[in-house]
Design a protein with these regions (language model features):
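Alpha/propeptide regions of enzymes that mature by internal proteolysis
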Residues: 1-73, 283
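Structural motif
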Residues: 2-5, 34-37, 67-71, 91-94, ...
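Active-site histidine-anchored catalytic micro-motif
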Residues: 3, 29, 33-35, 43, ...
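Short, basic/aromatic-enriched C-terminal tail that caps enzymatic domains
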Residues: 3, 272-286
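Short acidic, Gly/Ser-rich segments with clustered Asp/Glu that frequently serve as metal-coordination loops
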Residues: 10-15, 77, 179-182
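Anionic-ligand-binding alpha/beta catalytic cores of soluble enzymes and soluble regulatory domains
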Residues: 115-201
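A conserved acidic, glycine/proline-rich C-terminal tail/linker
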Residues: 185-273
């Protein structure tokens, strides 16, 4: 019996989680109760991709990947603006990683893009693309249950080419944490020629800020907006992160900043609270 982690854009809704859990347990053998963890994604497959890569890497480095299944579902059905018959969504796929961790769910957008190079085998399970507005409750549990009970050999699946997973090009907001730090999809190697204290211009949406490049997120004084190698991404090339060490004793501002000074604004607030998936432009100041 494997355990399950769910990464989905409905995972912050208690009713949806309960309905999914009830349906899944109903498909499992009696007295089988896997641990189920939920990680909420924004309505962006780029955010889901970022979360997936981080969960996979942590599980492979510190956990037991061969004892876990990841179920992803952020299928915004953005492939068409036309009417969708029978609520049809992206096809359900199963990816077996080299670490033996299993990742499954709709192959929607960029959800699998950041773990593409870790996939050893890639399959499609046909017949559950449509028929429900909440496929995670009504259609997917029967397949997920087989994976949890290690009965994937009983599933009628066809092998797929990895070319069906798009590459993620460009730089994006990957995640915004509860401190207001912006975790990007920019590898640290992009700024490897920069020195501590160099200025870099970062544009997210219609907001451009000059930020200091530092060797770590605490490399500048409180209240200074910095960009540095963070804690996410590949171990040998971490993603860059935008951060501010907030000064709890800073004096309040006036006007729009009443009750809050610039020194106490988080990185996210400096960029008008961007959403995961928003594109990032960066260029050096010489």
């Amino acid at each position: 019996m494997k355990n399950l982690t769910v990464i989905a854009d409905w995972a912050d809704d208690d009713l949806s989680k309960k309905e999914f859990t009830s349906a899944l347990l109903g498909e499992l053998a009696q007295h089988v109760n896997p641990r189920i963890d939920f990680v909420a994604s924004f309505h962006s497959s780029i955010h889901t991709a970022f979360l997936t890569q981080q969960v996979v890497q942590t599980e492979e480095r510190l956990g037991k990947p061969d004892e876990n299944v990841l179920f992803l579902n952020t299928d915004t059905r953005e492939h068409t603006g036309e009417k969708i018959i029978s609520a049809e969504g992206s096809p359900f796929v199963i990816a077996i990683l080299y670490s033996k961790l299993i990742v499954c769910g709709p192959n929607a957008g960029y959800s699998l893009s950041l773990i593409k190079d870790q996939i050893q085998q890639f399959f499609i399970y046909k017949g559950i693309e449509k028929g429900s507005q909440f496929r995670s409750r009504d259609l997917f549990p029967k397949v997920i249950a087989q994976l949890l009970m290690e009965k994937q050999d009983m599933l009628e699946i066809d092998e797929l080419e990895l070319s069906g997973i798009p590459d993620l090009t460009g730089f994006f907001v990957g995640h915004v944490d509860n401190y207001g730090n912006i975790k990007t999809t920019i590898p640290s190697s992009v700024l490897q020629s920069k020195l501590h204290g160099d200025l870099v211009k970062i544009t997210i949406g219609n907001v451009t800020r000059e930020v200091f490049y530092t060797h770590n997120l605490f490399g500048e004084k409180q209240g200074i907006l910095v960009i540095a190698s963070g804690s996410s991404g590949k171990e040998n090339d971490r993603f860059l992160e935008l951060s501010v060490r907030i000064d709890p004793n800073s004096k309040p501002g006036t006007g729009l900043l009443a009750g809050r000074s610039t020194a106490s604004k988080s990185a996210a607030e400096h960029f008008n609270n961007p959403k995961p998936g928003n594109p990032i432009r960066s260029y050096y100041l010489m």
